[in-house]
Swiss-Prot record:
Protein species of origin: Chlorobaculum tepidum (strain ATCC 49652 / DSM 12025 / NBRC 103806 / TLS) (Chlorobium tepidum)
Short name of one Pfam family: ATP-synt_A
Transport in keyword set: yes
Assembly and oligomerization: F-type ATPases have 2 components, CF(1) - the catalytic core - and CF(0) - the membrane proton channel. CF(1) has five subunits: alpha(3), beta(3), gamma(1), delta(1), epsilon(1). CF(0) has four main subunits: a, b, b' and c.
A Gene Ontology biological process term: proton motive force-driven plasma membrane ATP synthesis
Any one GO MF annotation of this record: proton-transporting ATP synthase activity, rotational mechanism
Localisation: Cell inner membrane
Keyword Cell membrane: yes
UniProt-recorded name of the protein: ATP synthase subunit a 1
Amino acid sequence: MHLSSDEVILWQSGFLKLNLTIVTTWALMLLLAGGSALITRRLSTGITISRWQSMLEIIVTMAHRQISEVGLQKPEKYLPFIAALFLFIATANLCTVIPGYEPPTGSLSTTAALALSVFIAVPLFGIAESSLVGYLKTYAEPTPIMLPFNIVGELTRTMALAVRLFGNMMSGDMILVILLTISPLVFPVLMNILGLLTGMVQAYIFSILATVYIAAATRTR
């Protein structure tokens, strides 16, 4: 038994390694890219649209409203990034129904990469909204003495994003293994259902936290 898919090495040459996390991550990206191309290839801008497009527009509208309720004034600017985070995490967790599949979100390297993308995106959005000088001034608010504390806070919340997602996914897997040894017939079915629900919740929480951080960086001063 291994704790993370990082430990499953599929190919190695010197210091170069290809582990299961990398393979599943790229497979998910190809799945999402291919699915997006298939779903959007027949979208219409006319008055008459298909039921499928109508459902997609409802979902996008709901996401748009959710982002605006968090505090972002121009949700359409941030929707692609936030939606990409949610779709990747949600799809990674939903695919656990496939036998033998191990979600990359159970790897700290993947969750750290997702958190790093948020860490980079937040100042970029902030600078785009209020200029470089205006954004940097926020680190000295409300007084300059808060500068080191604000910098540390920026770093620690990024670490918290990565560890929170990794810990929640890892704990779910460990509980499933424990219950499987107790009752191999009943508990696995219930835990798989609960695991799917938990995976969706974790994707939602991660996306909402990213939205909150972006809203804080782009708020009007």
